[in-house]
Amino acid sequence: PAEKLQAARQTSWRRTAIVSQSGAFLLNRFSQAPEMSPAYLISMGNQTDLTLGDMMRHFISSDEADVIAVYAEGFKDLDGLRFAQAVREAVRNGKQVIFYKAGRTPEGKNATSGHTASLAGDYMVCENCIRQAGAIMARNFTEFQELILLAEAFRNDAVNGKRLGAVSGAGFEAVGMADSIQSDEYSMSLGAYAESTRSAMQSCINEKHLDKLVTIANPLDINPGADDEVHAHMAELMLNDEGIDAVVIGLDPHSPVTHTLAETDVEAFRMDAPGGILERLSAVRERFRKPLVAVVDGGAQFEPFRNALRERNIPVFPVCDRAIATLSLYMEARLMVKGFV
């Protein structure tokens, strides 16, 4: 019903196609993350006519979709191979493919059979084949939609390595970022700053009288006393450093010196204030063609702030470990396909 899922009235859509064997999966993802704004939402059901392989082949040369996201429960006979081949062709054509495969457990396989009459097959075989074809593999539903948002935002950005820059005014968040750079699925590193970067960071810290509280490091804990200018300038310096390939910045929404609220009469907290973090970080994002991800770890009162960042092409996560994990999976997949010819 329109009352439960209102159609967005937009004049333009993102260059994304989401293909799913479940119509409800499509509706729920779009309801949770309307900012995805896909050009196509396609429900395949039990593939009685067109198959997942057919749909992937259609988008290989499409000039309307650069990101293709697929939720699959199973393939028709021999269609899994066609699908993997189409993924490889799509990636070679500059597309980004995001893939979630259902039926990972014996119970899950039985459930897919009852849902779309799909034979789920061996999950690990399927995952390895599609990954090697060049798709970005989502491990859960939340990650699926977050990877779509990263792919949309960073479609034209350079991914040249695995060296992250991390900055936050919350000590636990800086530690959490460092703790999240490696897992069984990915392995990133924290980049080393150039001497000119370290010098510029120290000058900023000295100017703001934070020098007795802040030590230049990666991750960079800039203390809760760091204002919007410090946050944005540190992100700018990191992105400008050739030794850093992407930046994750914690925006400390509860800090008394950051502008992160929409509904407030206190000018010092208003997110639309001139010179606030929204204005400053947007300018930084526009200047550099490297991935920049924000973390806004706070309650519902900060949702307008998160939405405003997303509108400015800055992906936002509610917790730092999810930000690092999703960005890492995305970057490693982008690096892998660089070798495809």
Regions found by a protein language model. Give the residues of each.
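Catalytic-core regions of core metabolic enzymes
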Residues: 1-341
